[in-house]
Amino acid sequence: MKKNFFEFSDKILSASDAAMKKAALKFAEIDEITEYNQQKVLAAFIHNRVSEADFAGSTGYGYGDRGREKLDSIYAEAFGAEDAIVRHSFTCGTHTLCVALFGLLRPGDTMLCVTGKPYDTIHSVIGLSGNGMGSLKDFGVKYEQVELNLNGLPDLTAIEKALEKKPRMVYIQRSRGYSLRPSLSVAQISEIAALVKSKCDAIVMVDNCYGEFVERTEPTEAGADIIAGSLIKNAGGAIARTGGYIAGKKELVELCAYRATTPGLGKEVGCTLGENRNMFMGVFNAPGVVGSALKCAVFAAAMFEDFGFKVTPSSSESRHDIIQALCLETPERLVEFCKGIQSGAPVDSYVVPEPWDMPGYDSKVIMAAGAFILGSSIELSADAPLREPYAVWMQGGINFASAKTAVMLAAEMLSKEGLI
């Protein structure tokens, strides 16, 4: 006998059934991409002859850590890059991006962001906020940006004009951040990279957070020179406990490695302290976990479309990251939605989220995140700045069944309050 563990109302059960039927074709497409990416990662493991001995951790300087070296090689192969540096010592995505930016840019260089203003958390790295903290601006690196066009897409004409100033770096943020603009496809990134290469010798860097394994190819296979991301997002597969990666052209990765450690030492040092096994398991499981997260996003889009809300991307649109934005129109709905997501978490389900002043953001933020790894956004989470357009951005889901249940609980919470 089928048991209704969470006492869902008939309204929400019917909405769930309708959303599942609506999402069926997109789910099949996600399964195909997941299988392709899983085979790609498996091939990288086999080519690199991974063994039990590679999981042993090193201490001290970390000289000769074979596991660390093979993990770098697996990431490079999976991402179609010449080289990679994957380290648990990268504390978050912002830190990893910061290492890459400081590794590649020098005083007098110009960083040109061609996808509008980047994530709030990177502003203080660039020098858009804060003074005297050691930002790129403090070290004489100039910053310019090209706004997106009215459709939220890269403005190629404006980018071409900006390239006349010969920037040292063209920076692309693949994901949407706290905006409703579309995430960028690898094909769109390729188009930007081709334009850049035709006009100057700038480094094309991509913030790849939330985008790994969503498509069959990565930006480094489509013209990007360097990419960076977090291991507590897609690439860590909900198993890596911390860390980040940088992948791309060998000489550029080397420069980033010199920044991550010291000039002259680079990738040759850095003990792994027993984290190798988790990091290997994480990237191996990443394609499947990303597939589950994508299904959760499509399911949520389908359900909330049927409730009459604007969602982006829609349940039928192509996906280029794992993020789903739901425009819930009022702060009350944001709060109740996040309470519902939190109530469906395996960890801290009893906690009631409240808006708070989160470091790095310019408005109060409410977050739902009951994760095994603190701050993980490949595990189901939702965040919403309490500002117009009162949208919530949700992402992640270790497995689809549990993530789907949490979305249903969020809908139930809204329904009980008379908000849908």
Where are these regions (language model features)?
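Conserved PLP-enzyme active-site core in the AAT-like
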Residues: 2-24, 31-32, 40-47, 51-54, ...
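Flexible linker/loop signature enriched in Pro/Ser/Thr and Pro/Gly
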Residues: 58, 78-81
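Short glycine-rich or small-residue beta-strand-to-loop segments that form or flank ligand, phosphate
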Residues: 58-59, 85-88, 322-327
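Structural motif
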Residues: 83-86, 109-112, 168-169, 202-204, ...
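Conserved C-terminal alpha-helix-loop-beta "cap" of PLP-dependent enzymes
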Residues: 305-420
